[in-house]
């Protein structure tokens, strides 16, 4: 992203070692910048003066995936059910369910199976 964190760290970079919700609270209370995922941001209500400055940048793409665990290595898994779930997630119905999930009317995820 063009930011040298090693150079910025002493004065400007802060790690909280916490989840995204608490990190948003810290940013709101200290007038800070924060990289946040869309779902947590949309669900977060204690925004104070926080506002989205950048969104949709391809360099921040955060893709989720689905995979079935190898039953030969993990015989306790319910492989058939896992495969059924994976097949559904990748199907048009699953992709529709993902696309239609909203928080406050805003989409949270952008399905791209088959892209």
Per-region residue spans from a language model:
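Exported/periplasmic ABC-transporter solute-binding proteins
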Residues: 1-115
């Amino acid at each position: 992203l063009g930011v040298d964190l090693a150079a910025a760290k002493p004065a400007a970079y802060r790690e909280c070692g916490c989840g995204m919700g608490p990190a948003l609270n810290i940013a709101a209370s200290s007038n800070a910048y924060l990289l946040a995922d869309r779902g947590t941001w949309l669900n977060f209500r204690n925004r104070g003066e926080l506002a989205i400055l950048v969104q949709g940048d391809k360099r921040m793409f955060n893709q989720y995936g689905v995979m079935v665990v190898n039953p030969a290595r993990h015989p306790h898994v319910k492989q058939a059910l896992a495969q059924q779930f994976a097949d559904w997630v990748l199907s048009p119905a699953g992709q529709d369910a993902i696309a239609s999930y909203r928080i406050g009317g805003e989409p949270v995820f952008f399905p791209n199976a088959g892209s």
